[in-house]
Amino acid sequence: MIIVYKTTNTINDRYYIGVHKTDKEIDNYFGSGLALKRAIKHYGKWAFKRETLFNYTDEDEHLAYAREQELLNVHLKDSLCYN
């Protein structure tokens, strides 16, 4: 399973959008962006929540990355976006 997800800092509402391949419905992955990692180190993992926006099969991985890019094209201009 491949997910397009949004990780949100519940303290300041900043967020990160990404793609993650997983076999589990729930795992502890929040993202790999440098700004996001710094924020997790600063605020602690408890301050973040991850929500799945879209699910894809492994065969449709290219669609997951295309959807992520569509979202980033809109959200990268947002000052709240960690990406």
Model-derived regions: residue spans:
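Structure-specific nucleic-acid interaction/processing domains
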Residues: 1-83
